Design a protein with these regions (language model features):
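Gram-negative host-targeted secretion-system effectors, predominantly Type III and Type IV
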Residues: 1-145
Length: 146
């Protein structure tokens, strides 16, 4: 498994050409594990009607914002036809580049019900917005002390 925010940026073919197939494999396995962790978190925090607030946080803590976003975006991009995902979440997913990779993308699709997964995506995005707001506030505070 790769560390939290370390992501291998190339496809399997590019990795093979670069002699970095083991790095690609580690990244791929981590993407698959992240998708599984998302499914487990949803299973744990969905009561049949509502997804518990903060459900995404445990997965973010384990895999990092970047990888969780990448895995979520992959699923939404591959299921763009599904009307159960909110349009704002689908639009957000298109801002993340997930390269075609010879069918490997389909291996780390998240299998949770789309309406519930949509709630998880919204929760993830709220966590990300909070992180960005805190970062901006910290930068402003740093500028004020200079």
């Amino acid at each position: 498994m790769l560390p939290n925010e370390a992501m291998y940026p190339y496809t399997a073919k590019e990795a093979r050409d670069r002699g970095e197939l083991e790095l690609w494999r580690a990244n791929f396995r981590t993407n698959c594990a992240c998708a599984g962790a998302i499914e487990l978190a949803i299973h744990r925090d969905f009561d049949g009607m509502h997804l518990k607030d903060g459900c995404a946080k445990s997965v973010i803590d384990q895999y990092g914002y970047r990888r969780v976003g990448y895995v979520l975006a992959n699923t939404l991009q591959l299921h763009a036809y599904d009307g159960r995902y909110h349009e704002t979440n689908k639009r957000w997913s298109r801002t993340i580049f997930v390269p075609e990779d010879g069918g490997h993308r389909h291996t780390f699709l998240i299998g949770s019900h789309p309406a519930v997964l949509d709630g998880f995506v919204s929760d993830y995005r709220a966590e990300l917005e909070q992180l960005q707001a805190n970062s901006n506030q910290a930068m402003c505070m740093g500028e004020m002390t200079m």
